[in-house]
Amino acid sequence: AKTPGNPRIVMALDGYGTNNKNNGFIFGGDLHGHLANYDVTLVAPISGDYAAGTYYTDYASPLDNGKTIRWETFLVQELPHYLSQYFRVPVRPHSTALVGLSMGSVGIMNLAQRFPERYSAVDSMSGFYTLSAPAQASSLAMGSALMGYRPRAMWGAWPSSQWKAHDPALNIRRY
């Protein structure tokens, strides 16, 4: 941000096409160049192999290797405090805009719906928005499995209450 202590943030979450060296919004989409004249802090986690197939959510149960996926916890609780402590970006309600691509779209839609007091805007591109539809739920589960994750570890067996709680179409009124 141009102004020190400015709480305005744009957080960009990648899709499957990301890698471990950079965020696709920066190196593939020049988001930092687009936002250069705006007084905002760009937060674009390099998620790569760490996120591909996770949909930036907290998994309901550990994976077979004992690993627990907690992207939502990181993005909502840990990252804001890290930014505050190390970059002097204050934690304020309605001060973060979310942008997501593909898998990142599912993540940002859920963040915005589950924590509406935190986020001011959402730009979601090419995601799964109706997880109550068998085809979209199957595609999401297949994407997770292709990346080596156990889809049932995410939100349980489809169509559980957790799947419904993370369905952007069913939860549209939360915005």
List each language-model region with its residue ranges.
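Non-catalytic cap/lid and distal C-terminal segments of serine-dependent acyl enzymes
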Residues: 1-175
